[in-house]
Amino acid sequence: VIPEAENVSDAFKSKLSAYVEAGGRLIVSGAHVALQYGDLAGVSPASGTAIGWLPAGNGAVKCSGSYQKTVLNGARVLHPVLENQSIPADDKELVPASTLNQVGQGSVAAIHGPIFRNYFQGRYPGLRQVIGEVAAALETPGLSRTCAPWYVEMALRKKDGRTLAHFVNRSVSGYQSSYYHLVEHVPDAGTFSIEIPMAEKPQRCYMSPDPVGLEWHWKDGVLSANISALHIHNILVIE
């Protein structure tokens, strides 16, 4: 991921090209992308910029800053820039906000505005969803994945020949304010699922130290598991 990094050296760009052509996945962002990464992103700059909204789920989120208008040269549109919160029936004239381009065995997702800077400053859930949709469009192979609320974090570790999937629930209930930061209660995150690539079928899987409900199966090199609850911290032990 190269977020809003302008004037990257040509030597580094050539390494990026080789990385993607060999099967790598890349996300670049910023209004400069069409001009500075055009060949890699499959676009060229058009005249003018656009401001407005980005489609996110069944709604839209306001995007701050300008999005560069582009001409598609092999890339396809992932998200358009909307003039308001509704997607028009005829979207032929919409400005691409994000695009996807296949390069060799890999692919490049480009976001043509300052979305990472916007998210850093505001943390709007809609922007997080757009970024997640762009990342998912890359279809990166070999990744472990969670289907869980955004506040559930997973970290994988190896110890004594076992794989340990740590889960942390970062949610909080009750009111928060600029002068009251106490967390009085962490609500259960509820049921969620994960997928972890594993070459061989595990002998055993269990949750520890909290033995919550667990259903798992292995197929075609992927371990899939449904976990019934997560309070604050728990571990899926894979043997």
What annotation goes with each model-predicted range?
Residues 3-239:
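A conserved amphipathic helix/loop scaffold
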